[in-house]
Amino acid sequence: MANAWKLEQFIEMLLGVTGVALGLSFMMKSGLGQTALTAFLQCISLISGMKSGTLLMCFYLLCVLLQLLIQRKDFDKLQVLQLPVCWIQGIIINLTCYDIAFLADIRPVSYPMQWVFLAVGMILVSFGVTLTMAADLVKQPFEQLIVVISKKYKKPFNFLRCGADAVFITCSLLLVAEIGRAHV
């Protein structure tokens, strides 16, 4: 019975991760709003030519490696499940935004449709996060890194998370300004 429960949790986590990735894709396509992290990664994508999903995979992998370095022997083996999270989310974003033509070509054609895309994205991300949290196996790699840093250095999670978002937003704005200067 315990194995069936673990399988159910794993499936719930996979559905949640998929929901988050699809939601991020919709939000990115909306052109109106997204997370601080995905905004930063999209700026890097514009500069480097790398796909946003690939950059997300690399960033999440870095987060898992940093967790391992910080926690060392205290690293919970279950957290290795963050690696498929990295891969699944990156692949889904790449498939829906770049690789599968009929999905990549779906874009909002009007301002009201941009809002619809944003709303659908937010709903999918919320649903995905809810499923992932309910599965209670692993968190998103970036969130887990902030948790690890918070515990290690005895700093409030919300302070560190808001600080990280502020850094990503600041970097995004600087990159957008630089991209704008390069195209003038």
Q: Model-found features: residue ranges?
A:
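Mid-bilayer segments of alpha-helical transmembrane spans in multi-pass integral membrane proteins
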Residues: 87, 91-99, 115-135
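C-terminal ends of transmembrane helices
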Residues: 10-16, 63-75
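Short amphipathic alpha-helical coupling elements at transmembrane boundaries
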Residues: 39-49, 144-154
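Short, Lys/Arg-rich, polar N-terminal cytosolic tail immediately upstream
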Residues: 1-8
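Conserved small/polar residues in nucleotide/adenosyl-binding loops
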Residues: 182-184
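Hydrophobic, membrane-inserted alpha-helices
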Residues: 61-67, 165-172
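Cytoplasmic-side transmembrane-helix entry/capping segments in multi-pass membrane proteins
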Residues: 77-88, 110-115
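Structural signature of hydrophobic alpha-helical transmembrane segments
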Residues: 47-59, 114-119
